[in-house]
Swiss-Prot record:
It is found in: Nucleus. It comes from the Eukaryota. Keywords: Activator, Nucleus, Transcription, Transcription regulation. Its main location: nucleus. Component of the Mediator complex. Component of the Mediator complex, a coactivator involved in the regulated transcription of nearly all RNA polymerase II-dependent genes. Mediator functions as a bridge to convey information from gene-specific regulatory proteins to the basal RNA polymerase II transcription machinery. Mediator is recruited to promoters by direct interactions with regulatory proteins and serves as a scaffold for the assembly of a functional preinitiation complex with RNA polymerase II and the general transcription factors. One of its GO terms (biological process) is regulation of transcription by RNA polymerase II. This is Mediator of RNA polymerase II transcription subunit 22. Belongs to the Mediator complex subunit 22 family.
Length: 138
């Protein structure tokens, strides 16, 4: 069972790595093509206006591809965060244990202070009762 879990984690991490490389490569390739098209030094059989329109359309398509790759990268980051939040039980357990230990120590501290106040009040009340019952003005 543990081995299958480890293999699935490795496969998931490999797929994340593959997606990352593909998206970055797509962004880089499309950007390079946009820069190449912006130079406008292509000698073709088409008229200058036709070539300009074709280059403009290709730049728009490549810019859309860059945006798509960027959105894919943002989705990848979201998936990685979700994976870490849902599958990182060790650190979650550590956080829960440390916070519960902090709350227990705070509770014990408060309980000790309350017991000290109770003892002081009981001693003061005893002194007041003794003074009252021994007083000649009662």
């Amino acid at each position: 069972m543990q081995r299958n879990l480890t293999q699935s984690k490795e496969a998931l991490l490999k797929s994340y790595n593959t997606r990352l490389k593909e998206d970055v490569r797509s962004m880089l390739d499309n950007f390079e093509e946009i820069v190449r098209l912006a130079k406008g030094e292509n000698e073709t059989q088409f008229s200058k206006m036709t070539q300009c329109e074709q280059d403009t359309y290709e730049m728009q398509v490549r810019a859309s591809n860059i945006v798509r790759a960027g959105e894919s990268l943002m989705k990848l980051v979201s998936d990685i965060k979700q994976y870490l939040i849902l599958n990182d039980f060790h650190s979650v357990n550590e956080a829960i244990c440390s916070s519960s230990q902090l709350y227990r120590s705070t509770q014990m501290d408060r309980d000790n202070k309350l017991m000290a106040v109770r003892d002081d009040m009981a001693a003061d009340l005893y002194d007041l009762e003794e003074e009252y019952y021994t007083s000649m003005y009662k």
